[in-house]
């Protein structure tokens, strides 16, 4: 890991893959996701790409800023990172909340992006928002688990999971992570991130994106419904929309998804 000192915090970041100016990609992780937690996805990307990824503010080693962040702050952090790395133009990959930050970055700095991949995400505003995860924080554990299950995949129930062992493994992993004890600072950071997330809205600015754009979604996503990806597609000229068999984690559920994303980013 390396660090970058910003005015209000120290940003922790890491590089993966073989350095290659033609295959640079800036990766934005999802809600609550750190570099460490996202290594399976990052490592797969790094097999083909020159990856830069950071623990976004409020998460992981980067820690908490002194004030509540905005989506613009998350995009500004990324700009500071690529400027620090000396990257002029590069591809961007954003998944879930990371797709929201990627959109904010793309509408603010469209000239920097060569290709944009947006997975299981939403534009906000009139285009549709993802499930309000901040509302789950204070629910009883059983109710939070029930809603989180359907948010992952609207098909998930006991009968479905009994017949789909891979999906059962996904759910077991989600439940195991939910039992891990967190510090007061970690919990506060997650709340701060989700509070920024609830105000995400790039709907009226999506027309600023002109680079080749792939929008990918799962047909059974309860967090970021496929209709939200269709809305993004309608606002970005020349964009490509691909739908997959799966939910919020379709990139793991549908074997076609990851090769399609890699093919797009390396195209």
Q: What is each PLM-predicted segment?
A:
Residues 222-228:
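Conserved alpha/beta-hydrolase "acid-adjacent" motif
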Residues 94, 98, 102:
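Gly/Ala-rich beta-loop-alpha elbow adjacent to hydrolase catalytic centers
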Residues 103, 107, 114-144, 189:
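Flexible "cap/lid" loop of the alpha/beta hydrolase fold
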Residues 238-267:
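Catalytic active-site module of serine/aspartate enzymes centered on a nucleophile-bearing elbow/loop
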Residues 209, 215-217:
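Short beta-strand/loop motif that positions the catalytic acidic residue
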Residues 148-198, 205:
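Conserved alpha/beta-hydrolase catalytic His-Asp/Glu region
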Residues 7-64:
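Conserved HGGG/HGGXW glycine-rich cap/lid loop of the alpha/beta-hydrolase fold
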Residues 52-93:
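Active-site loop/oxyanion-hole signature of alpha/beta-hydrolase fold enzymes
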């Amino acid at each position: 890991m390396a660090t970058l000192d910003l005015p209000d915090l120290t940003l922790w970041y890491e590089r993966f893959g073989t350095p290659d100016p033609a295959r640079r990609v800036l990766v934005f992780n999802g809600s609550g996701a750190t570099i460490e937690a996202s290594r399976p996805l990052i490592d797969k990307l790094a097999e083909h790409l020159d990856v830069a990824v950071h623990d976004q503010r409020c998460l992981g080693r980067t820690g908490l800023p002194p004030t509540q962040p905005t989506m613009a702050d998350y995009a500004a952090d990324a700009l500071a990172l690529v400027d620090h790395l000396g990257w002029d133009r590069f591809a961007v990959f954003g998944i879930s909340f990371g797709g929201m930050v990627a959109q904010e970055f793309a509408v603010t700095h469209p000239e920097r992006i060569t290709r944009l991949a947006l997975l299981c995400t939403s534009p906000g505003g009139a285009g549709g928002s993802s499930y309000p995860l901040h509302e789950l924080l204070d629910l009883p554990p059983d109710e939070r688990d029930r809603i989180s299950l359907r948010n992952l995949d609207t098909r998930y129930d006991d009968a479905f999971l009994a017949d789909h062992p891979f999906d059962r493994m996904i759910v077991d992993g989600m439940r195991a992570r939910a039992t891990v004890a967190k510090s007061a600072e970690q919990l506060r950071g997650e709340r701060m991130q989700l509070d920024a997330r609830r105000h995400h809205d790039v709907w009226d600015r999506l027309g600023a994106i002109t680079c080749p754009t792939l929008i990918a979604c799962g047909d059974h996503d309860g967090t970021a419904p496929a209709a939200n990806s269709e809305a993004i597609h309608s606002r970005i000229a020349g964009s490509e929309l691909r739908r997959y068999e799966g939910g919020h984690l379709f990139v793991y559920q549908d074997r076609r998804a990851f090769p399609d994303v890699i093919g797009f980013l390396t195209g």
